[in-house]
Regions:
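Unchanged
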Residues: 1-132, 143-168
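C-terminal segments
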Residues: 135
Length: 168
């Protein structure tokens, strides 16, 4: 979609209000005739529930849910230019992707596409491991991965924390 529309695009997923503190979120208008596609108008990093209710409501999205980033993005060179300008204007300022995306949405078409996949929080404890296991278990080498996991679990059961077999 980003290529055919010649614009930046991000995957989003309707996310319940209680999880807003984990994700950046967007608001925009649904594009007529294109299910799950929105023209982004607002971007806020980890909004509070009050801020989300005031600025991120999207018609057609269930009450108490907001369009949060899924972690997939395709950017035009404009985004890199914006980030560079933000850094140049104040080298001591913290520059965030969300701030640059908010500016991008003001300058050019920026789309959000609903993604129905499962989101994994790589910043959470064991998040990266969980994501890697999910990918491996859904891949073509699933049986080999399961075999290795079972061997690892069996080996662990056969030894104590000191590496000694049980019962000694």
């Amino acid at each position: 979609m980003a290529e055919t529309e010649s614009c930046s695009a991000s995957g989003v997923q309707p996310t319940r209000e209680s999880l807003l503190s984990r994700f950046g979120a967007v608001a925009g208008r649904r594009i007529s005739g294109r299910a799950g596609v929105y023209r982004v108008e607002t971007v806020i990093e980890k909004p509070t529930p009050t801020e989300a209710e005031q600025r991120l409501m999207v018609p057609g999205i269930r009450a108490g849910y907001y369009l949060c980033f899924f972690g997939t993005h395709v950017f035009t060179p404009t985004l890199m230019d914006l980030l560079a300008r933000m850094l140049e204007s104040d080298p001591h300022r913290t520059v965030t992707l969300s701030a640059a995306l908010a500016e991008l949405a003001r300058q050019e078409q920026y789309l959000a596409l609903e993604d129905t996949g499962r989101r994994y929080d790589l910043g959470a404890r064991y998040g990266l491991l969980t994501a890697q296991l999910a990918l491996a278990l859904n891949g073509r080498d699933r049986n080999e991965v399961l075999t290795h996991l079972l061997e690892l679990l069996a080996e662990r059961e056969m030894t104590t924390g000191e590496g000694e077999p049980h019962g000694r």
